[in-house]
Amino acid sequence: MGPDELAELVDRHSAALVLYARQWCGCPEDVVQTAFLKLVRLRARPDNLVPWLYRVVRNGAIDASRAARRRQKYEAAAADRADPWFSPSDDPTGLDARTATAALADLPAETREIVVAHLWGGLTFEQIAQTVGSSAATCYRRYAAGLATLRQKLGAECPATPTR
């Protein structure tokens, strides 16, 4: 199959194939692209090209849907098994683990990464800077801002001055 013939086939059928695949999976464009790649790699052209494309797209979309369900199931199971950031405490005056975890999760990702790396990982700001690709001063500022946000949300005592 020549490039012009393939381009015409893509132009004529790709939109309908994407719509067709969308009923089974959340990545219909990927499935359609894979179907066209399979077509290009064939040694012999299928007798009924358009029905062949629909069958390949259908099978690919169903496979993608199954893979997504499996992935979601395993990711949910892994999240359920993951250790919480905070351990529940028997001290009624202490922080509630769920509230503290939620407050930490609400921080921007780059700030949360720095707070966790410094508080729980024991990394210095220089080490964190090397890890995240920022300067130590930027990491320090984000850490201080993260602690201030946590302090405000939790009404908890946090170290006022982070240690370098």
Please describe what each predicted stretch is:
Residues 5, 130-131, 147-164:
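C-terminal edge and immediately downstream basic/flexible tail or linker adjoining helix-turn-helix-like DNA-binding
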Residues 1-29, 40, 44, 112:
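A short, charge-rich alpha-helical start-of-domain segment used by transcription regulators
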Residues 48, 58-77, 93:
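Arg/Lys-rich amphipathic alpha helix in sigma70-family domain 2
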Residues 17, 21, 28-40, 53-56, ...:
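Short, small-hydrophobic-rich alpha-helical interface motif
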Residues 105, 109, 113, 121-141, ...:
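Helix-turn-helix DNA-binding module
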Residues 23, 99-108:
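Short amphipathic alpha-helical boundary/capping segments
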Residues 100, 114-115:
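Short alpha-helical "packing" element that flanks the helix-turn-helix/winged-helix DNA-binding module
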